[in-house]
Amino acid sequence: MSNLEHITLEMDKVPLGDNKTLVRNTENISKHSYGGAIDGRTRNTLRVPRAVPETDDDDNDDRPFVKDGNDNPGVDDGLFSTVGGNGGNGGNVNVNVPNGGRRPSFSFPGYNGPGFVTINGVETPIPDVNAYQHKKTLAQGMMDLALLSANANQLRYVLETSSQHPYFYPSLLFISLSIIFQIAVGVGLILNGQYNIKNGHDICRANRINNYTVSGIFIVTVVNVLISAFTVDRDTVPALPANTT
């Protein structure tokens, strides 16, 4: 018996559980026979990629379908139009594309006339923008025009004072200017309330008159500050010299 045969017989007598190298080699060989791969350097089993059937992600898609007869899924259907203004995949979804591809603009609620809106189950009429804007402008203007009564009282007080007072004429001038500008502002507010802001020409005129009224209110405010600074007081009227002749 040769030495090689003797070594082979001795190795056959060794249990497999005591020789870890032999066990590992046996496992690698068995795995390789079933499709595994063995790294030549580390003798470890490599994972061999296998072709698996692809799953369609759209099978369990819970997005709504466009009701155009073709069951086009997704929320993007109809956003991009093809020839004829229809959505993708040959659907019959009509897409209204404005000029230049811009998003269509919607008017303010109530701008095109009075309508109705449901609030807590109750139909509430929407006020007309014209009437609302006019009432708001008139209310703001009338709050400023309330100063007219105070100026009228101040004018009466100055006229009852002697003209010898040093602030008599400045006070008379400022009070008169305040009253005149307040009357002009009131006329402008009344004219501004007559225009229809739905009309392009009327809204330009109303805007111009509104600018004039704002300027007039500013002038009235400045003039009344000057009136407060140059107040006429009867106690400070200089006494007339007595006639000694």
UniProtKB/Swiss-Prot annotation:
Residues 1-170, 233-245 are extracellular. Residues 149-165 are annotated as: Helix alpha2. Glycans are attached at N19, N28. Residues 192-211 are cytoplasmic. One of its GO terms (cellular component) is plasma membrane. Disruption phenotype: No visible phenotype; flies are viable and fertile with no obvious developmental abnormalities. Residues 135-146 are annotated as: Helix alpha1. The chain crosses the membrane at residues 171-191, 212-232. Pfam families: Ninjurin. Residues 92-101 have a biased composition (Low complexity). The keyword Cell wall biogenesis/degradation does not apply. Keywords: Cell adhesion, Cell membrane, Cytolysis, Glycoprotein, Membrane, Secreted, Transmembrane, Transmembrane helix. Belongs to the ninjurin family. It comes from the Eukaryota. Induction: Up-regulated upon injury. This is Ninjurin-A. Residues 32-101 are annotated as: Disordered. GO terms for biological process: cell adhesion; cytolysis; killing of cells of another organism; programmed cell death; tissue regeneration.
